[in-house]
Amino acid sequence: MASSTDVRPKITLACEVCKHRNYITKKNRRNDPDRLELKKYCPNCGKHQAHRETR
């Protein structure tokens, strides 16, 4: 079972525009302590949008 202090936890990325949660990925907490933000394709909007880590 994954602990809450896992070094590489699973995170969900949500579109900044439509707020749909489109992607699940992993991140390294030691290298990226802040919230992750990537520009990815949103199938709901139909174009590339900024996706941000959700809690």
From Swiss-Prot:
InterPro entries in UniProt: Ribosomal_bL33, Ribosomal_bL33_CS, Ribosomal_bL33_sf, Ribosomal_zn-bd
Origin: domain of life: Bacteria
Keywords linked to the UniProt accession: Ribonucleoprotein, Ribosomal protein
GO biological process: translation
GO molecular function: structural constituent of ribosome
GO cellular component, one term: cytoplasm
Signal peptide interval: none
One Pfam family, short name: Ribosomal_L33
HAMAP family named among the record's database cross-references: Ribosomal_bL33 (MF_00294)
PANTHER family: 50S RIBOSOMAL PROTEIN L33, CHLOROPLASTIC, LARGE RIBOSOMAL SUBUNIT PROTEIN BL33C
Family in the record: Belongs to the bacterial ribosomal protein bL33 family.
Protein name: Large ribosomal subunit protein bL33B
Native species: Mycolicibacterium paratuberculosis (strain ATCC BAA-968 / K-10)
Organism phylogeny: Bacteria, Bacillati, Actinomycetota, Actinomycetes, Mycobacteriales
Gene: rpmG2
